[in-house]
Amino acid sequence: AASDVYKRQGTLSSDGTRLENLRVLFQAPGVDGNGHFGSRVVEAPDGHLFLTTGDRQKFDPAQDMARVEGKVLRLNRDGSVPSDNPFVAEEGARPEIWSLGHRNIQGAAIDASGQLWVNEHGAKGGDEVNRVERGKNYGWPVISYGVHYDGSSIGEGTKRQGMEQPVLFWDPSMAPSGYAIHTGEMFSDWEGDHFIGSLKFDYIARLDPQNGFAEERLKSPETARVRAIEVAPDGSVSYTHLTLPTKRIV
């Protein structure tokens, strides 16, 4: 059966127990299938919303400008389309599109400069970190550092003119999930570092952008299957596990 992807907005109740006045900001068309939903939402410093969509395991939509699947979308807070989006004036293109050629974005974060970063699942290998720029094409499924699960090649290889390269890729894949960028006094040596959870190898990756995105793997029995990561204003780092309560790195 077809399944839809919704982005909703609501208000937290005064007692902090529920969301009220829910309304739909964006709804993607229903697609048959059960995977590659994407569905991360982050707010830029200027108030615009970035929404991620997966390719819904259909390959072609990620490069189809008339489709919203496999894209990063940019909306105003009320769900309307900003007039300065890159493809607003392009005939046949969905005006919400900010970037294209994505497979399945599972994490998104904004750094101190307002730059959007995402991580996304490859197929067998080829999980990526991408610095998302206005109007850019990130290649899926034309280029990839992964292969199909049967070992066959994907698309044309790893590079093509006019398509962006990832800042970092993992092979074997690590199944990236939650994404946060560090600020705050606690763990001040980590200022500006990127934190990404792994659903596959049970660790949190700390990436240092000042050192070529060198990776340190923070691992314990309690970091298994990390889904979400948050950095508080004081710099403390918390994460959620799929089956355990929220944990904090101390």
Predicted regions and their residues:
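Hydrophobic, well-ordered secondary-structure segments
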Residues: 19-23, 35-38, 46-52, 65-69
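Generic C-terminus detector
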Residues: 225, 231-242
